[in-house]
Amino acid sequence: MSSESLFSKISPQSPGQEELVKVLADKKYEVVGLFGPTGSGKSLFSVIYGLDSVITGRYRRFIVTRPIIDVVTGRELTSADLGELYYKIVQSYIEDLVSGFVEWSRVQELVSKGQVVIADTHYLKGRTFDDSVILLDDAQSLPVESAIEVITRLGKNSRLIIAGDPVFQRSIGSRDSASMLRELLLGEENARIVDLGLKDIVRPGARRGIKLLLESKMRSRQLDETEKLVLSSLRVHAPDADVVTVVNLVDLKKTYSITSEHTPDALVVAKEGYQGRVVGRGGERVQSIERDTEMKIRVVELTLDFKPFIRAVHPVSWVYKHVVDVDFAGPNIAVKIESNAYGPFVGQKGVHVRFLDHFFRRILDTGVRCYEVEVEEGRSAKRSRAERK
């Protein structure tokens, strides 16, 4: 089987996946870090690349290491705990990934020849991997020290791929290994980071699962007294509405001296399809809640698009029109903003973006980073005319 025929079977479906493929194909990067949510293609592309590398002879071995976690206790299980079952579990994971791309009998042949090797990170001392591709998957579930141990095992003509989820596969308030490894690799020579986001999740099932994870994070928030007050009023005036959470913004507005009338006192996050039931046919429900609580309320639906959240709470009412993209990049939400609106978006001394950062940390335990992007002159002029109207 040729390299081209195997790797061509998996086509990138998003700009992030296209960048991933380019980075994997560029041998100048000895260490490649792939960070993003479940379903974005990290493991699939990495495993196909590794298999392709040994089949074509570019590398002698493909080493796969992946922690196995007991979902009940949260404890990592080693090959000493599980014996032969440890290797069978990892092989099953590889089999599920490559189904439809390469015959499993071909992979088993590579395993029997020692060209595909499953390794336990706990038992790597004294080993050196020459002429090998090493995949360290699910890095968020490993101690950073274990991941660094893998890096020290890199020998001549070898590459390391580290894949992890720094957002959805960590507990609230924790500092996971994937985030720390990403920071460590950012400044390393011959290392390259590829951040994958929600737009890189192409399977409908995976997108649904990520949305449920987001919803679970929001629903598990501990509400303060103000948020409980709003929720109680919601249950009276909108009993048929499915509300995910309520976010108090009063204290944040005081902290960052936000005086804009556009920013509400509280944000209600409704499950997708239920925003209308919170607001009411003519807005009468949300108006009743505002009278009850003496607060300004705004409502958004929970989808995989965070732009409506920025539109709902940012102090500058029109700035959302200049938001080019909002998605996860590593452990943070990255907001790309047109250069002509970058100043108002950030605010004086960064007060607006610090307000947004605090808001998203409160609702999702995730920070915000903003990036200025240039836009075509024609598009910018068209935008300005539209705003004047």
Language-model-detected regions and their locations in the chain:
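Extended basic-aromatic, gly/pro-enriched interface segments that bind polyanionic ligands
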Residues: V107
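Short, Lys/Arg-enriched, disordered terminal segments
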Residues: M1-L6, R385-K389
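C-terminal structural cap/anchor segments
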Residues: L110-S112
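RNA-contacting regions in translation and RNA-metabolism proteins
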Residues: D200, G205-K389
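Hydrophobic residues in beta-strands of the RecA-like P-loop NTPase core, especially within AAA+ ATPase
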Residues: L135-D137
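Short amphipathic alpha-helical interaction segments
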Residues: A139-L142, Q348
